[in-house]
Amino acid sequence: MREYKLVVLGSGGVGKSALTVQFVQGIFVEKYDPTIEDSYRKQVEVDAQQCMLEILDTAGTEQFTAMRDLYMKNGQGFALVYSITAQSTFNDLQDLREQILRVKDTDDVPMILVGNKCDLEDERVVGKEQGQNLARQWNNCAFLESSAKSKINVNEIFYDLVRQINRKTPVPGKARKKSSCQLL
């Protein structure tokens, strides 16, 4: 079974843990409890293939930035999360993306931009078009709006990253050459 190392990044309070826990355990965490770093494992089926996802839920606060390079180096796919209710969380993602590309030393990194808390439409300050435009600027990066509370697009975030990783590095042995045996 293929393993995938996924990393969830973004500012504090955007709902990184809520999205991760909703995906892994199927529950919504109401209380905000800042994360230092949590790791989750979940077996899922994506496109008829069994996958083991290792999801790293990271700290949003600035005090743990020293750990970032390490999990950026080890991660294969990245969910960059902002809250649609806080412009600053959207603005913070450009630096995070640049750091990922620098650590990975490539522009081709499986990544998805996630506008979380889309259930709070009346508190929205970051328009959907802003997210779509940023994703376009980022080499047509995948983009979704989600809600951990309302279970909107939660699974899709992680499944999309798995598909991107599969496209970038296909499963070994899946595309076998056709060979023939000729008897003389």
Curated annotation (Swiss-Prot):
It is an enzyme of class 3 (hydrolase). It comes from the Eukaryota. One of its GO terms (molecular function) is G protein activity. A lipid is attached at C181 (S-geranylgeranyl cysteine). The modification Phosphoserine is found at S179. The modification ADP-ribosylserine is found at S39. PROSITE patterns: RAS. It catalyses: GTP + H2O = GDP + phosphate + H(+). Activated by binding to the GTPase-activating protein RAP1GAP. Activated by guanine nucleotide-exchange factor (GEF) EPAC2 in a cAMP-dependent manner. A motif (Effector region) lies at residues 32-40. It is found in: Cell membrane; Cytoplasm, Cytosol; Cell junction. NCBIfam families: small_GTP. Belongs to the small GTPase superfamily. Ras family. Heterodimer with RAP1GAP. Interacts with EPAC2. Interacts with SGSM1. Interacts with SGSM2. Interacts with SGSM3. Interacts with KRIT1. Interacts with RAP1GDS1. It is linked to Thrombocytopenia 11 with multiple congenital anomalies and dysmorphic facies: A form of thrombocytopenia, a hematologic disorder defined by a decrease in the number of platelets in circulating blood, resulting in the potential for increased bleeding and decreased ability for clotting. THC11 is an autosomal dominant, syndromic form. Affected individuals have chronic and persistent thrombocytopenia, dysmorphic facial features, and multiple congenital anomalies with involvement of the cardiovascular, genitourinary, neurologic and skeletal systems. This is Ras-related protein Rap-1b. It comes from Homo sapiens.
